[in-house]
């Protein structure tokens, strides 16, 4: 891409980023930042602090702190600095729904690390390949609508792991190019992988791969592997005595084992992948090409395992952004994976509804996710299959013909960025218009139950996968019959004489997939008097009803009123909020222009292409 068009792309993306950075957000952004403050307001061990909070485990079984320490502790340091400078009042936040936490100035401040990571990743991607190919790779990263959606709009942290991974690739390729200094650069690659794994686990599986391909002797290979594994263990060692960290921060669905496959099957596939890596390292030719092939191949394996949340696609797109300029065969996989990620976001708990509207209007929060919208499952399955086939085909072709023959497609990044507004418009149209339900604004009080009473509560799940449901019993506890049914009348769990303890009581469920938008009923019939209440829900669960002996409990919904959100109401709220926050938009524009200008200068002046 020539300098004028290259600069135009940066200008367009900078303007778009300045608009969406303070005005869009996902609930995970608020939960992660609120919980990060516990490090300096509660106790230094975050996972012990979170375990005592209502946000520790949601009624759906997912965690309020599902990531590794190298996300939360830098976030806490950033929040502490903002608090010390009186930009935010982090110590005054009452919870994840605090208005000051969800204000547009606060959202902008919270997302600045994501902006820095997004721009830094572009620079690293460019330097990894160098020259015109590096600039093209940076454009494919910066202009990708899925990357912008998940990293800058929703505020997800997968870009952090992507940055660590591509930085490891950069140092690994440099280590292979140099006759001297290789071990030091190789060690830096290992440290980057360890850092990425201490945010989200997947990069740890690249440690033996990089060690094998970078090390020039068996001794050097072992030392490099020890550096990567040792650095990772050193970072997580302070938390290994905390059960909550093992269950959620290390091996939980969100942070670690996301695949639907059994562990033995995933291990077998990984072993097969490692055998290909060993074979690639023994082939004649450029070892840098083998390292790049192995890097892209690992992310293809991760993609094909399935079970990951849509925001994980940022990792795959980063790998493919590096691969496309080197081998044009990867372009089809890049486009299909991007399309699959965007489609998955449409059907994944209405992420677009929350991400697009939540900071600008409260009305969208009153719409339960995906209750009346259709799930494009056939298209989802087809696109996933096509993406996997295209990726594997590109890897096979690259295996047969190692080398570099990437083709420049100057118009591609501009088409990518133009696709984002179109996609957001389509996503907006898919918002449900109404449902026969009315949300409650404050949780119901704890209910005193006598022997023979029947207390039940009903809620709509925001999660596709429901693993457990939690309720609280006031001091005393007791024995009760407990059952869980879905809205089709099927009994998912039934315990005729469960011993309830004071505090949280978690009901484990058989794996319940595609639960989003469906209702579930929990019924409790005590053998003796006790007091029980629902867990205080996060905003997306603030739609539920409770009954005592068949009579609705005050403070909950009876699911009888029809609620409808109008488009003029949504846009009216948004325009009012934007007008009142114009200063925040000006600050956002200034910061984005400065950040993109620095990124442009670094990427534009990138030297000639490397041989990797």
Predicted regions and their residues:
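Transmembrane helices and adjacent periplasmic/lumenal helix-loop junctions
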Residues: 157-159, 190-212, 301-313
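N-terminal membrane topogenic signal
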Residues: 1-9, 408-412, 581, 603-604
């Amino acid at each position: 891409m020539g300098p004028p068009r290259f600069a135009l792309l940066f200008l367009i993306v900078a303007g778009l980023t300045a608009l969406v950075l303070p005005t869009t957000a996902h609930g995970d952004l608020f939960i992660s930042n609120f919980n990060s403050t516990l490090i300096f307001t509660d106790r230094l061990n975050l996972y012990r602090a979170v375990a005592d909070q209502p946000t520790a485990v949601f009624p759906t079984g997912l965690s309020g702190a599902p990531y590794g320490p190298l996300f939360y502790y830098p976030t806490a340091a950033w929040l502490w600095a903002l608090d010390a400078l009186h930009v935010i009042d982090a110590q005054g936040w009452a919870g994840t729904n605090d208005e000051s936490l969800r204000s547009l100035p606060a959202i902008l401040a919270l997302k600045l690390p994501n902006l820095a990571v997004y721009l830094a990743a572009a620079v690293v991607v460019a330097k990894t390949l160098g020259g015109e190919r590096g600039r093209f790779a940076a454009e494919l990263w910066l202009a990708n609508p899925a990357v912008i959606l998940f990293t800058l709009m929703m505020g997800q942290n997968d870009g952090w792991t992507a940055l660590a991974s591509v930085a490891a690739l950069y140092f690994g390729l440099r280590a292979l190019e140099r006759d001297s200094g290789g071990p030091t650069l190789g060690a830096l690659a290992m440290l980057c992988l360890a850092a990425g794994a201490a945010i989200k686990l997947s990069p740890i599986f690249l440690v033996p791969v990089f060690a094998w391909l970078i090390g020039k002797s068996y001794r050097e290979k072992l030392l490099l592997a020890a550096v990567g594994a040792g650095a990772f263990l050193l970072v997580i060692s302070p938390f290994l005595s905390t059960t909550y960290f093992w269950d959620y921060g290390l091996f939980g669905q969100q942070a670690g084992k996301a695949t639907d496959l059994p562990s033995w099957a995933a291990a077998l596939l990984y072993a097969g992948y490692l055998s290909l890596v060993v074979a690639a390292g023994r082939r004649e030719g450029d070892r840098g090409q083998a390292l790049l092939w192995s890097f892209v191949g690992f992310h293809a394996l991760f993609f094909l395992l399935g079970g990951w949340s849509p925001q994980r696609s940022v990792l795959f797109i980063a790998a493919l952004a590096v691969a496309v300029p080197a081998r044009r065969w990867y372009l089809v996989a890049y486009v299909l994976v991007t399309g699959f990620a965007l489609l998955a976001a449409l059907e994944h708990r209405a992420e677009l509804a929350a991400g697009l509207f939540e900071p600008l209007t409260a009305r969208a929060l009153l719409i339960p996710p995906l209750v009346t919208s259709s799930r494009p499952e056939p298209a989802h399955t087809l696109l996933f299959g096509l993406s996997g086939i295209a990726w594997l085909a590109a890897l096979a072709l690259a295996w047969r013909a190692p080398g570099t023959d990437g083709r420049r497609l100057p118009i591609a990044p501009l088409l990518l960025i133009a696709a984002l507004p179109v996609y957001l418009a389509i996503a907006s149209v898919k918002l449900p218009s109404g449902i026969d339900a009315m949300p409650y604004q404050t949780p119901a009080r704890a209910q005193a139950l006598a022997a023979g009473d029947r207390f039940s509560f009903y809620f709509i799940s925001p999660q596709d996968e429901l693993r457990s449901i939690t309720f609280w019993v006031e001091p005393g506890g007791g024995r009760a019959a407990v059952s869980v049914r879905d809205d089709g009348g099927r009994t998912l769990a039934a315990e005729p004489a469960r011993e309830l303890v004071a505090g949280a009581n978690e009901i484990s469920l058989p794996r319940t997939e595609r639960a989003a938008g469906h209702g579930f009923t929990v019924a409790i019939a005590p053998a003796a008097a006790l007091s029980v209440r629902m867990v205080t829900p996060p905003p997306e669960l603030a739609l539920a009803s409770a009954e005592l002996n068949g009579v609705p409990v005050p403070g909950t919904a009876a699911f009888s009123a029809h609620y409808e959100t109008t488009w003029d109401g949504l846009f009216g709220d948004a325009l009012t909020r934007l007008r009142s926050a114009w200063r925040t938009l000006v600050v956002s524009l200034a910061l984005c222009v400065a950040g993109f200008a620095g990124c442009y200068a670094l990427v534009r002046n990138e030297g000639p292409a490397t041989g990797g």
